[in-house]
């Protein structure tokens, strides 16, 4: 089971890790500021990217713990993790082909809504009705599939408007740092925070297990923030449903 869990974790990081071997030439701060002023989508999209990955990685880091300890499915945790990533992987090309007729941000909004809807059922899962968690895996797997492709396409579209390849490289690297920061922050808070509270026997909210706070309440709250940010982005930059 440990081997299966390792495989599942590897697949997850494979999705999000990026190769940034290129080394852009030096560029002035004035050019960067000028580019930001001329393309206000960058800062708004950076916030969406950070919080979206933050929410996703909260659940990814605590998946095994939630399934093993809270649902009591220790022997099946690795299989469920692989099932989740398999559904996500299968749904990714479907989002791509489906998305050809729609705008990127509309698809991201739709995927976020699907994820929030599916993840909401976590509130009703327990060791006595763990079967409900299979529905969570299926729905959220489809919703998260959009996060593996659409944000990258949207970023590419934003940077395509810039004729200076060096600036594009800098902001591609910048977004890579944002992604890695989100992964690191999520891992630090989720694993360290939850682990510490469990070790000292302290509950953040009375009658609510800490694992439900870190695995469910925090991520779904962040996802709702992401949904609001995406909707504001579409409204601010007049992004229609159709691409």
Model-predicted regions and their roles:
Residues 85-93, 184:
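Residue-level signature of mid-helix packing/kink "hotspots" within the transmembrane helices
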Residues 130-148, 154:
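Hydrophobic core of transmembrane alpha-helices in multi-pass small-molecule transporters
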Residues 73-81, 129, 133, 211:
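Juxtamembrane helix-start elements in MFS-like secondary transporters
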Residues 1, 183-208:
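Transmembrane alpha-helix termini and helix-breaking/packing motifs in multi-pass membrane transporters
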Residues 1-64, 68-69, 73, 209-243:
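Intracellular loop-helix junctions on the cytosolic face of multi-pass helical membrane proteins
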Residues 74-75, 162-178:
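Loop-to-transmembrane helix entry/capping segments in MFS-fold secondary transporters
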Residues 113-131:
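C-terminal ends and interior cores of transmembrane alpha-helices
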Residues 90-106:
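Helix-to-loop junctions at the C-terminal end of transmembrane segments
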